[in-house]
Amino acid sequence: MGQKTNPNGLRFGKFKKHFSCWYTENKNYSHFVKQDIFIRKFLMEKIKNVFISLIEIEKDNKETVIFIHYLNFSKFNKVETNSEKNEINLFKLKNLLLKSLNSFFNVKINFNEFIIKLIEIENPILDVRFIANDIRYKLEKRMNFRKIVNSTIANIINKGIKGIKIKLSGRLNDAEMAREESFREGKVPLNTLKANIDYFHCTAKTLSGSLGIKVWLNK
């Protein structure tokens, strides 16, 4: 069963904390869920100059705290760029978010009740979301999928992780027939909850169709 369900869902509470942490009465539950979805979608659309890996939301009776895990491309690529373009203007972002929330949900949220905190990713090559999106970007640039995966595994496997598994599906390299290709290095035991498995999937949009990308990382 471990290979037929989302590995993240099985491990919440043991190795992972939930991406949304709050408690409310039943009558407000759906409203809070919709609000979380709106916040994540809004932030992902508005923040284009850095890579957003994860958005965590914590709420209590007094305030809402949003943790944005991000990667600054200029630091990762070690290229001197305009620093203003690679920074997140928290004040402006917070104002836009509150205006959108108040308008969409017809509520009045105080500016001081909302806190946005930035957490920079220290080691992006060990971030499963960055790995999957990096593969997606290269596939959309029509690079050979085997070269992409082999270089990805070579960069990761000696960085302190126990194993990695990558699965690609679709019309790979513009083939006439869709197929599935799997790559594994090290140990990725999906049938035990003792393993700290991080998982992410995304889709690459290419001229030959959509390509599915799944990445498992055993830390």
Swiss-Prot record:
It comes from Euglena longa. InterPro entries: KH_dom-like_a/b, KH_sf_prok-type, Ribosomal_S3_C_sf, Ribosomal_uS3_bac-typ, Ribosomal_uS3_C, Ribosomal_uS3_CS. One of its GO terms (biological process) is translation. CDD domains: KH-II_30S_S3. The gene is rps3. This is Small ribosomal subunit protein uS3c. Keywords: Plastid, Ribonucleoprotein, Ribosomal protein, RNA-binding. The keyword tRNA processing does not apply. HAMAP family: Ribosomal_uS3_B. PROSITE patterns: RIBOSOMAL_S3 (PS00548). Residues 39-111 form the KH type-2 domain. One of its GO terms (molecular function) is structural constituent of ribosome. Belongs to the universal ribosomal protein uS3 family. Part of the 30S ribosomal subunit. One of its GO terms (cellular component) is plastid. It is found in: Plastid.
